[in-house]
Amino acid sequence: MRRESSTVVALAGPVRAELLAGLSRSPNISVVGGGAPAESANGQPSGEQDWEPGARAMREAARRRSTYVVVADDPLAGVAAAWRAMWDLNTGAQGAAGFEDQAAQALAAWRGKQFELPDYYLLVPEPAGSAGADLHLGPLRAARPRRVALATIAPADREGAGLLASLRSLEHGPWWPPLDDLLDAARTFFAGGLTETQSYPT
């Protein structure tokens, strides 16, 4: 369990650069992550695992002393993408295998104390028509409803006002269960039961 004085909030979803820039200008808010993927010495992608950018950002967030530290990289990003793909009927058995691979990598890193989960996940709305099965709105929110929130962001918002208001509305709740319990819950969670979407309002 995290014990730092700052509240660490990880953003999930398509985060526009101007929203992060707007947040970074707000008093008592630090923004971490959201940069380009890491490259190797020859300028090619480094081949790092999907949890690593989020883990680095979470470690950096732990060193900040702002009231809120907003993290634009999620250590569970690979798990979330694989969970969504698993519900795509076109992927077949490969979808489930991909999820298990990502889950094993993230769980090993978490057990190795490479990262901890943020205090909260704040979901950035996706463009209408592109939303699908979502790990955060599904099994994670079912496990800890007050640890996952859907941001209210208008498409015309360029300064992060919606994100800022969403940060201030977060409610305290029980801490996360162990990551292996969350992953087990994801294996049995029925994505078709989701009643809330994460699309922009029309």
Locations of the language-model features?
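Extreme N-terminal, non-catalytic leader segments
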Residues: 1-8
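Short, well-ordered beta-strand core segments
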Residues: 69, 120-123
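Glycine-rich phosphate-binding loop used to anchor ATP phosphates in small-molecule kinases
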Residues: 46-116
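Short glycine-/polar-rich loops that comprise or flank the Walker A/P-loop
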Residues: 115-120, 145-148
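Hydrophobic anchor at the beta1->P-loop junction of P-loop NTPases
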Residues: 11
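NTP-dependent small-molecule kinase module
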Residues: 2, 15-16, 127-202
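Short catalytic/ligand-binding loop motif for oxyanion handling, primarily in non-cytosolic enzymes
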Residues: 18-19, 77-81, 130
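Conserved substrate/cofactor phosphate-moiety recognition/catalytic segment
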Residues: 14, 20-66
